[in-house]
Amino acid sequence: MTYNIVALPGDGIGPEILNGSLSLLEIISNKYNFNYQIEHHEFGGASIDTFGEPLTEKTLNACKRADAILLGAIGGPKWTDPNNRPEQGLLKLRKSLNLFANIRPTTVFKGASSLSPLKQERVEGTDLVIVRELTSGIYFGEPRHFNNHEALDSLTYTREEIERIVHVAFKLAASRRGKLTSVDKENVLASSKLWRKVVNEVSQLYPEVTVNHLLVDACSMHLITNPKQFDVIVCENLFGDILSDEASVIPGSLGLSPSASFSNDGPRLYEPIHGSAPDIAGKNVANPFGMILSLAMCLRESLNQPDAADELEQHIYNMIENGQTTADLGGKLNTTDIFEILSQKLNH
């Protein structure tokens, strides 16, 4: 079997971190004996510059045919038209591929806890995953309108939309430490009342998982005061957007965090959580670990290569523990150095 991978370098530092990661993929495929082919497509601001829109039909169709999609980063101050922004292409891609589940791990690596803005003893050992519903909720609800006197957004969830994301979270929790925290605002929001009801019903199918409920404001506090208590957190779109960004600063650098977006039966999208960082683009100083860890998620989830994913992740953990990092993590290496060291390790 030959896996079909679509590469979307995007904007800013996206091309350099993605292209370096693809060089690692070539080494890994030879080592673990699997085949793949890459289709490169412009996306985001780069696509606006070339084609006048952030996501062309050609790119979208290629993504629909793919086994996996790797995205570098998109956006930047260059693209200011509110009706034609790079981020709109990403929203359209998620919706078109029905990428309803966003998986965001937050891990404080051994040897890197001093980088956290929180006390070391508070964050050491943190290993949590936020499962965010990605294609419904207030970002997509209708009706919506805006004028100078009034604005309206609609927060709507159906039972089916809640059930499918909650099943993803329960299955993930069952494969980890068996603890699921469901986040809502059940004390005031009707949508959250349905959310909590559905979570409780679905929990009966997963007796091995312990479930607790937290209001979103309480969860935001506990993420700071005791992040180690969490295993898997599941929440609706808006809450997940905020909480996952909050959690991402716990390790001390946005450059350490990967993410994946899943559908039930189509291609999956893998990307680091950081932005395009146009201020450092092309300077060979970007931290590529988030992109490489996203590649590891892709190896495990879409390319059926769990051993390769484990090896790649372990090499990264060892590098971080030994201080072999870029400047944002307190190290002295540049982007190219990171890829060269990993290439040497993988070739052994």
From Swiss-Prot:
Entry annotated with the keyword Amino-acid biosynthesis: yes
GO molecular function, one term: NAD binding
E.C. numbers: 1.1.1.85
Binding site for NAD(+): 76-87, 275-287
Details of cofactor binding: Binds 1 Mg(2+) or Mn(2+) ion per subunit.
Binding-site list for Mg(2+): D217, D241, D245
SUPFAM superfamilies in the record: Isocitrate/Isopropylmalate dehydrogenase-like
Binding positions (substrate): R94, R104, R132, D217
Top-level EC class as recorded in UniProt: oxidoreductase
Any one of the GO CC terms: cytosol
Requisite cofactors: Mg(2+); Mn(2+)
GO process annotations (BP): L-leucine biosynthetic process
Top-rank taxon: Bacteria
Pathway it works in: Amino-acid biosynthesis; L-leucine biosynthesis; L-leucine from 3-methyl-2-oxobutanoate: step 3/4
InterPro entries assigned to the protein according to its UniProt record, in alphabetical order: IsoCit/isopropylmalate_DH_CS, IsoPropMal-DH-like_dom, Isopropylmalate_DH
Purpose: Catalyzes the oxidation of 3-carboxy-2-hydroxy-4-methylpentanoate (3-isopropylmalate) to 3-carboxy-4-methyl-2-oxopentanoate. The product decarboxylates to 4-methyl-2 oxopentanoate.
Family that this chain belongs to: Belongs to the isocitrate and isopropylmalate dehydrogenases family. LeuB type 1 subfamily.
Record's protein name: 3-isopropylmalate dehydrogenase
UniProt organism field: Staphylococcus aureus (strain bovine RF122 / ET3-1)
